[in-house]
């Protein structure tokens, strides 16, 4: 995300001051109207401008930021301008906790972001990894270790992986073993999920993260990541096989790590079960039961 300036325009800046003083209604209306929602593109420039002003104001903005994060779907319905309010709150929370080293604020921020990572409103969920990455850019490996408490949930695990893959967080991660532990935990969560979980949006979000983030990790840490993907390839779960296949096809890797991607592909190929041999079918196994009696 590019560097942004604060809120512009007399109406917005005046409404922001009123909101800080405990009168947020006018700010909520202005932000909602300029949100771009309902629509396909959220006004992230405006959300970032709000976050910048919250950072500039410091601790005095925290009450408003947390209030906006806590707006539920009744007060801020999904797919409406109202959904933009918690989006702004989440982004501002990430900015504020990144700029203020207060442990209490960071602990509270992580608790709020953990809860919102599984919010019913998908735009709120989508901004959580961005907020986490802001925090990760200053916390580094400490946050990677904190994510051990995130990888026991589908949406939370997806948010943690996506945050670590962000370009402002990944370069400051030095503990490759901790990162790979989070990747292993996320993979195990998906692998050990009941079959019915495949219909759950959280499972799909985690599988999507497993398909997209390992390539970024591999560009940072190289062969150790490929070693783990080789083990992940040994599965018959179609969603996880597709995730590994997406890793192999990643344009980030095909030229620089051609031999390693081929190694993962060979592991995938080797894990394909042999085709069923019809000559081994036992006579009388087919056609039994009530349907046969009705022929």
Regions found by a protein language model. Give the residues of each.
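Generic ordered-secondary-structure signal
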Residues: 39-42, 61, 81-84, 91, ...
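Extended alpha-helical scaffolding segments
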Residues: 54, 169, 173, 182-275
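Eukaryote-skewed repeat-based solenoidal scaffolds used as protein-protein interaction platforms
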Residues: 78-204, 208
């Amino acid at each position: 995300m590019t560097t942004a300036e604060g809120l512009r325009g007399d109406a917005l800046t005046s409404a922001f001051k009123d909101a800080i003083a405990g009168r947020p209604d006018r700010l909520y209306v202005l932000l909602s109207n300029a949100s771009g929602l309902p629509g396909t593109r959220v006004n992230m420039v405006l959300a970032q401008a709000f976050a910048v002003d919250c950072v500039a104001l410091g601790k005095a903005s925290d009450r408003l930021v947390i209030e906006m994060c806590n707006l539920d779907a009744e007060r801020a319905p999904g797919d409406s301008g109202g959904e933009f309010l918690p989006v702004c709150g989440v982004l501002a929370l990430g900015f504020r906790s990144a700029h203020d080293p207060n442990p209490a604020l960071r602990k509270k921020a992580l608790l709020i972001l953990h809860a919102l990572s599984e919010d019913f409103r998908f735009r709120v969920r989508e901004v959580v990894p961005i907020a986490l990455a802001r925090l990760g850019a200053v916390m580094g490996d400490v946050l990677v270790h904190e994510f051990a408490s995130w990888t026991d949930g589908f949406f939370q695990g997806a948010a943690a992986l996506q945050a670590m893959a962000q370009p402002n967080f990944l370069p400051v991660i030095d503990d490759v073993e901790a990162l790979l532990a989070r990747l292993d935990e996320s993979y195990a969560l998906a692998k050990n999920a009941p079959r019915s979980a495949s219909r759950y949006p959280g499972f799909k979000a985690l599988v999507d993260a497993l398909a997209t983030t390992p390539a970024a990790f591999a560009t940072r840490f190289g062969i150790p990541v490929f070693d783990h993907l080789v083990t992940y390839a040994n599965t018959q779960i179609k969603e996880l096989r597709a995730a590994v296949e997406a890793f192999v096809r990643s344009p980030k890797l095909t030229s620089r790590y051609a031999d390693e991607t081929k190694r993962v592909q060979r592991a995938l190929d080797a894990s394909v079960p042999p085709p069923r041999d019809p000559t081994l079918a036992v006579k009388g196994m087919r056609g039994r039961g009530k349907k046969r009696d009705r022929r």
